[in-house]
Curated annotation (Swiss-Prot):
This is Nucleoprotein. It comes from Influenza A virus (strain A/Turkey/Ontario/6118/1968 H8N4). Homomultimerizes to form the nucleocapsid. May bind host exportin-1/XPO1. Binds to viral genomic RNA. Protein-RNA contacts are mediated by a combination of electrostatic interactions between positively charged residues and the phosphate backbone and planar interactions between aromatic side chains and bases. A motif (Unconventional nuclear localization signal) lies at residues 1-18. It is found in: Virion; Host nucleus. Encapsidates the negative strand viral RNA, protecting it from nucleases. The encapsidated genomic RNA is termed the ribonucleoprotein (RNP) and serves as template for transcription and replication. The RNP needs to be localized in the host nucleus to start an infectious cycle, but is too large to diffuse through the nuclear pore complex. NP comprises at least 2 nuclear localization signals that are responsible for the active RNP import into the nucleus through cellular importin alpha/beta pathway. HAMAP family: INFV_NCAP (MF_04070). InterPro entries: Flu_NP. The gene is NP. One of its GO terms (cellular component) is helical viral capsid. Residues 1-21 are annotated as: Disordered. The keyword Lipoprotein does not apply.
Length: 498
C-alpha cells in the first residue's frame, strides 16, 4: 500500500523491500539503477550504437520502451490471443536514430521479446528486477506530465481542466505497483475511480460474479491508496464513505470530484522521485561508477550529482529552442511538472518558463516526421543547487492543510508560500452540502476558507550547494510572495493521447 500508515520510504516501495535501514535502502536503490545502466550498455552494444548515439535521449526512450513491452505480461498474453495484422506478438522494437554522413537517419529495429528479457535479467543478476522496470515507467510518466496537458481526460471524467496540478502520474500503467501508487496525484486516483464507477453504472455485471469480486477488491484498494494521500480527517472520512458504498454510483462520483477540488487547497501527499533516462545510468556505469557500493537515493543529492556530470543529447526539430527542450527534460528528470516555477528556477539557476511560452514539442519524434531537417543539441540538465524531494504536499502545520494554488504540487522541500486564488477555487463549492457526507463537506469547506495564501510551507527548509552532500547548510530562498508560479498558465501544449 502507498498509504502513509505503512512507513516504508519510497525507495523501499521502489525496490520491493521490507523495512531496511538507510544504508540498505541506498544499496538496493543503487543496485536497481546500476542494473538499468548495465542493461543500457548491453543494448547499445547489441544495436552497435556509437557513443554519441547512445547518449541520444530518443534512443534511450526506445530502448526503455522495448524492455517495458517485453515484460508486459498482460499485453503479451492479449496479443497472442488476439493476433492483429502486422503485429508479431513475440517481437518488440522502435525507432533507433543513427548519425550518417552528417545527417540523422531513423531505422526501425525489431527484437525478440525473449532476447530482451534475457539481456535485462543478465544485467540484473538473473532476476526480473521489477523495481527497475517501475523506475523506467515513472521516468516516462514524469516526462508525460511535463510535456502534455490532460484537459480532455479531466473534462471527460467531469473534472475541471484547471485541476491539472493534481494529475501527476496519470499515464502510469496499472502494473506500476506501490512505487507507482506513491507518485500518483489525487486527481489521477480520482479519475481512475470515476472511470471504474462509470463502467459499473453502464455495465450491470461489472460488480457481479467472480470477476466482480476481484473488481470490488481493486476498487477498495484504490480507495485506500487515495485515502492515504489525504491529510485531514474529514477528507479521509469521506473516502471511507466512498469505499464502503454498496453500489457505487453518481453520489460517489460527486464526492470524489468534491475531494479532488478540495485537494487544490488541502493538498494530498504525493511522492516525488528523480527518475532519469536509462542512458544516464548507462554513462555512469560505463565510466566505472559502482552504484550498489556507493549507494543511491532518488530523493536526495544523487540524481543532481549524476546530471551534473552527464552529457545527453536530443534531436531538435527545425523551429524548436534547445534551451526550452532542456527545460522540459530537466523538469521531467526531477518530477517537477507541478512545482512552483519560482522554486524550480531558483534550484536550476536559470529561469524556468511556463509551458505556454516554450518553443518545443515533446521529446519523442513521430514516425512520419521528416528526418532530413533534424538537428541535435546537448541538453542542459545541470542545476545551481539541489533540494530534497518531498512527499508531503506542503501543508503548513497549523492546519495540517494550507494554501494551494490552482497548479502547484510541491516537488522540493523548500520554504515558500503557496499562492492560490481562493475565489476561483471556492466558487466551485457553492451549493450541495446535503446528503450522507454533509458534515464532512462542511468541515472541509471550513478548513479551506481558513487557509491563507501567504502562509509559509516547509518552514526553514532550503536548498543546498552541490558541494554540500550531507545537507548541512540550508540556503532559504526568499520569493516574491505575490508572484504566481504555475507551469500550466496560458497553456497550449498538445493533449496526451495513447
Amino acid at each position: 500500500m502507498a498509504s502513509q500508515g505503512t512507513k516504508r520510504s519510497y525507495e523501499q516501495m521502489e525496490t520491493g523491500g521490507e523495512r531496511q535501514n538507510a544504508t540498505e535502502i541506498r544499496a538496493s536503490v543503487g543496485r536497481m539503477v546500476g542494473g538499468i545502466g548495465r542493461f543500457y550498455i548491453q543494448m547499445c552494444t547489441e544495436l552497435k550504437l556509437s557513443d554519441y548515439e547512445g547518449r541520444l535521449i530518443q534512443n534511450s526512450i526506445t530502448i526503455e520502451r522495448m524492455v517495458l513491452s517485453a515484460f508486459d505480461e498482460r499485453r503479451n498474453k492479449y496479443l497472442e490471443e488476439h493476433p492483429s495484422a502486422g503485429k508479431d506478438p513475440k517481437k518488440t522494437g522502435g525507432p533507433i536514430y543513427r548519425r550518417r554522413d552528417g545527417k540523422w537517419v531513423r531505422e526501425l529495429t525489431l527484437y525478440d521479446k525473449e532476447e530482451i528479457r534475457r539481456i535485462w535479467r543478465q544485467a540484473n543478476n538473473g532476476e526480473d528486477a521489477t523495481a527497475g522496470l517501475t523506475h523506467l515507467m515513472i521516468w516516462h510518466s514524469n516526462l508525460n506530465d511535463a510535456t502534455y496537458q490532460r484537459t480532455r481526460a479531466l473534462v471527460r471524467t467531469g473534472m475541471d481542466p484547471r485541476m491539472c496540478s493534481l494529475m501527476q502520474g496519470s499515464t502510469l500503467p496499472r502494473r506500476s505497483g506501490a512505487a507507482g501508487a506513491a507518485v500518483k496525484g489525487v486527481g489521477t486516483m480520482v479519475m481512475e475511480l470515476i472511470r471504474m464507477i462509470k463502467r459499473g453504472i453502464n455495465d450491470r455485471n461489472f460488480w457481479r460474479g467472480e470477476n466482480g469480486r476481484r473488481t470490488r477488491i481493486a476498487y477498495e484498494r484504490m480507495c485506500n491508496i487515495l485515502k492515504g494521500k489525504f491529510q485531514t480527517a474529514a477528507q479521509r472520512a469521506m473516502m471511507d464513505q466512498v469505499r464502503e458504498s454498496r453500489n457505487p454510483g453518481n453520489a460517489e462520483i460527486e464526492d470524489l470530484i468534491f475531494l479532488a477540488r478540495s485537494a487544490l487547497i488541502l493538498r494530498g501527499s504525493v511522492a516525488h522521485k528523480s527518475c532519469l533516462p536509462a542512458c544516464v545510468y548507462g554513462l555512469a556505469v560505463a565510466s566505472g561508477y559502482d552504484f550498489e557500493r556507493e549507494g543511491y537515493s532518488l530523493v536526495g543529492i544523487d540524481p543532481f550529482r549524476l546530471l551534473q556530470n552527464s552529457q545527453v543529447f536530443s534531436l531538435i526539430r527545425p523551429n524548436e529552442n534547445p534551451a526550452h527542450k532542456s527545460q522540459l527534460v530537466w523538469m521531467a528528470c526531477h518530477s517537477a511538472a507541478f512545482e512552483d516555477l519560482r522554486v524550480s528556477s531558483f534550484i536550476r539557476g536559470t529561469r524556468v518558463v511556463p509551458r505556454g511560452q516554450l518553443s518545443t514539442r515533446g521529446v519523442q519524434i513521430a514516425s512520419n516526421e521528416n528526418m532530413e531537417t533534424m538537428d541535435s543539441s546537448t541538453l542542459e540538465l545541470r542545476s545551481r543547487y539541489w533540494a530534497i524531494r518531498t512527499r508531503s504536499g506542503g501543508n503548513t502545520n497549523q492546519q495540517r492543510a494550507s494554501a494551494g494554488q490552482i497548479s502547484v504540487q510541491p516537488t522540493f522541500s523548500v520554504q515558500r508560500n503557496l499562492p492560490f486564488e481562493r475565489a476561483t477555487i471556492m466558487a466551485a463549492f457553492t451549493g450541495n452540502t446535503e446528503g450522507r457526507t454533509s458534515d464532512m463537506r462542511t468541515e472541509i469547506i471550513r478548513m479551506m476558507e481558513n487557509a491563507r495564501p501567504e502562509d509559509v510551507s516547509f518552514q526553514g527548509r532550503g536548498v543546498f550547494e552541490l558541494s554540500d552532500e550531507k545537507a548541512t547548510n540550508p540556503i532559504v530562498p526568499s520569493f516574491d510572495m505575490s508572484n504566481e508560479g504555475s507551469y500550466f498558465f496560458g497553456d497550449n501544449a498538445e493533449e496526451y493521447d495513447n
